[in-house]
Amino acid sequence: MAAQRPLTIALVAGETSGDILGAGLIRALKARVPNARFVGVAGPRMQAEGCEAWYEMEELAVMGIVEVLGRLRRLLHIRADLTRRFTELKPDVFVGIDAPDFNITLEGNLKKQGIKTIHYVSPSVWAWRQKRVFKIGRSTHMVLAFLPFEKAFYDKFNVPCRFIGHTMADAMPLDPDKNAARDVLGIPHDAHCLALLPGSRGAEVEMLSADFLKTAQLLRQRYPDLEVVVPLVNAKRREQFEKIKAEVAPDLAAHLLDGMAREAMIASDAALLASGTAALECMLAKCPMVVGYRMKPFTFWLAKRLVKTEYVSLPNLLAGRELVKELLQEECEPQKLAEALLPLLANGKTSHAMHDTFRELHQQIRCNADEQAADAVLELAQ
């Protein structure tokens, strides 16, 4: 009698964040189905968990229109080859992890061949290009969403979606140790501390750094003991920031950090940051914040017409109200930013109320996402 084929899960991850999610999912699945087989496009973490890599993740990790166009032929070849090989393999479930421009079409190809498909991490369809939801619905059997308002959006369009909570909320403690973080960064326990996070992209650092630095200078006048910490994502962004600081605020003492954004947030009394995932991480660090964002006028004009949400920051979208002050475009200027940050640095009622709400929101999205994702995969595999 032929041996029964082990549970076979195909996965495609296109960048580091997807590799981390994929590794967590594989770990959770192996705990329940030890002989399961995992194949696809994987990074080093997924491979370390036992995923057989038909292609290296770096093949898909291209950013920007110019880079994508330069690699388009190769990307299309990989997608066609994966469609053929997965169709021959007939995995029990295919999981496309993020990388929506690559994965959603691949999921559609496989669904037509009778393969069950999951898209793990919802694209921001609730915010812009909402019509993508119809293609997602045609291409997948299930979307796994990090945030409850994402599931509510898919429900409106009758697209099967499961809210699994956020892996970052699982990884971060409900009550972070501020003094321990300060010890790591060399910041006195009794000092006021402000984190500046001017973004991870070059354009963001260019547009925001000067205003953020001038804001810190204004706040230092009110709080002479103010410690300023600036985590920067890589050496390139650090060099860019240092150049701007030398022009705008050469005398402002600041701790420039290589990475360590999470430690900086936990250590700080308040943060001034660009929108994006950093705002969610800051909420989970229980650090009161102000979001400041500026873009080129035409880009902003276009964004206002395309973006369908009332708020830009994830804490506000989760809360359904303006929990965090958002100062955009001409509002994003030092005087207004400083005025918004002052009550947070005072560590009074405003920051305590924000902290308590952050903790409630953290609990809402702390659902053991790896296990929930594994549940969804196994249910679909039956």
UniProtKB/Swiss-Prot annotation:
Record keyword Ubl conjugation present: no
GO biological process: lipid A biosynthetic process
Enzyme kind, highest EC tier: transferase
A GO-annotated cellular component: membrane
Reactions this protein catalyses: 2-N,3-O-bis[(3R)-3-hydroxytetradecanoyl]-alpha-D-glucosaminyl 1-phosphate + UDP-2-N,3-O-bis[(3R)-3-hydroxytetradecanoyl]-alpha-D-glucosamine = lipid A disaccharide (E. coli) + UDP + H(+); a lipid X + a UDP-2-N,3-O-bis[(3R)-3-hydroxyacyl]-alpha-D-glucosamine = a lipid A disaccharide + UDP + H(+)
EC identifiers of the protein: 2.4.1.182
Record flagged with keyword Lipid metabolism: yes
Pathway recorded for this protein: Glycolipid biosynthesis; lipid IV(A) biosynthesis; lipid IV(A) from (3R)-3-hydroxytetradecanoyl-[acyl-carrier-protein] and UDP-N-acetyl-alpha-D-glucosamine: step 5/6
Example GO molecular function: lipid-A-disaccharide synthase activity
Highest taxon, organism lineage: Bacteria
SUPFAM superfamilies membership: UDP-Glycosyltransferase/glycogen phosphorylase
Family per similarity comment: Belongs to the LpxB family.
Job of this protein: Condensation of UDP-2,3-diacylglucosamine and 2,3-diacylglucosamine-1-phosphate to form lipid A disaccharide, a precursor of lipid A, a phosphorylated glycolipid that anchors the lipopolysaccharide to the outer membrane of the cell.
HAMAP family xrefs: LpxB (MF_00392)
Name of the molecule in the record: Lipid-A-disaccharide synthase
Organism: Salmonella agona (strain SL483)
Taxonomic path: Bacteria, Pseudomonadati, Pseudomonadota, Gammaproteobacteria, Enterobacterales
